[in-house]
Amino acid sequence: MELKGSKTEKNLMEAFAGESQARNKYTYFASKAKKDGYEQIAAIFQETADNEKEHAKMWFKLLQGGEVKSTLENLKAAAEGENYEWTDMYDRMEKEAKEEGFDHIAYLFTEVGKIEKEHEERYKKLIENIDNGLVFSRDGDRIWKCRNCGHIVIGKSAPEICPVCSHPKAYFEIKAENY
């Protein structure tokens, strides 16, 4: 049987959306319960949010043919999704909110749309970095920082293994200072 176009596919999409929304909502509820002094209730909300995340992941995998795609494919899908959000979705929502007199909400849709555009550009740059072999290696020396222990290495490439904590190259990034 073909899942594409079936009622079951539609149900999987609804289940994924519902579980994803519930996870976020319960995370917000956990934060509020913690602020209100209810540690146990916060923990229960957080545990439930974690359960909902796993449910969403299960439905997502079924929609994707049983697996989460490669990082490069995921970056491309993410860039495409962000493009839709800023070029179509938020643009339409901004116009509709204005027509209905919700000027502040229209403004928020516009501003979030600008953020989504930045997200798309960031994903496209990461795609370019993977395609050009620039994630862990650059022309000229760079300051590489281990995200696990904070060890600093200066060179054209991140080390294969962190000499301090033994974590793999995957934990290194170019050190950014914005302070």
What are these regions (language model features)?
Residues 1-179:
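Non-heme di-metal
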